[in-house]
Design a protein with these regions (language model features):
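Glycine-rich, charge-dense phosphate/pyrophosphate-binding loop(s)
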Residues: 81-174
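Gly/Ser-rich oxyanion-binding loop with an adjacent helix/lid
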Residues: 1-27
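Solvent-exposed alpha-helices and their adjacent loops that cap or buttress functional pockets
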Residues: 2, 8-10, 30-36, 121-123, ...
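Generic hydrophobic alpha-helical membrane-span motif
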Residues: 12, 52, 139-141
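Short beta-strand segments
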Residues: 11, 41-45, 132-133
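Conserved hydrophobic/aromatic beta-strand scaffold that supports enzyme active sites
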Residues: 7, 17, 39-41, 137-139
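A short secondary-structure junction signal
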Residues: 19-21, 27-29, 50-56
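Acyltransferase
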Residues: 33-91, 95-98
Length: 174
């Protein structure tokens, strides 16, 4: 993408925590830690949601902003380091629930189907599946940063999900 969040993520590198809106140097404040982690993005090819559906709607604006502020408030209480990954995974789940994004049936169904494949592959102890903020997509992430997902595990997951009709792309946190 080319939105502000994408640009800031690229400029901060690694895993960012945006403390204040805006970009660094223009009022924004971002913390980050570096890690290199392979991951998968998964989506339903026939489903599309445009960001404007959410950011142009007052109800969505309010619920997303409130949920995000609560999560950031909890995350900023301690130093932002590699060891905070489990906290980030917890807050990403909390955000999806509190914002109402997880209440949309198409998202809930996608998350459920991907989680079922992870269980079938017996990789639930190694993987977190998290909704992407907008659109109908999920990220498949390592449960622990000191135990990156292996190429074979990523290939097995990708093959299983493609066989079920999902779009899958391998990418990474850098």
């Amino acid at each position: 993408g080319s939105g502000l969040g994408d640009v800031l993520g690229i400029s901060a590198r690694g895993v960012e925590l945006r403390l204040e809106p805006g970009s660094p140097g223009a009022g924004g404040k971002v913390l980050s830690f570096t890690t290199h982690q392979p991951l998968l993005l998964v989506w339903r090819p026939e489903e599309s949601r445009h960001t404007s559906t959410y950011i142009d709607d007052e109800g969505w604006q309010r619920s997303i902003s409130n949920a995000g502020e609560r999560s950031v408030s909890r995350l900023r209480r301690k130093e932002w380091t590699f060891e905070r990954w489990p906290d980030l995974m917890l807050e990403s789940r909390n955000f999806a629930e509190a914002s109402g994004l997880l209440n949309e049936e198409v998202r809930k169904e996608l998350l459920s189907q991907v989680q079922k494949e992870i269980l079938r592959l017996d990789l639930q102890a190694r993987v977190n599946v998290r909704l992407c903020m907008l659109g109908v997509s999920v990220s498949i992430l390592p449960r622990r940063l000191d135990e990156p997902l292996l190429d074979g595990e990523l290939s097995d997951i990708a093959d299983a999900l493609r066989a079920r009709g999902f779009g899958v792309r391998r990418t990474s946190i850098r």
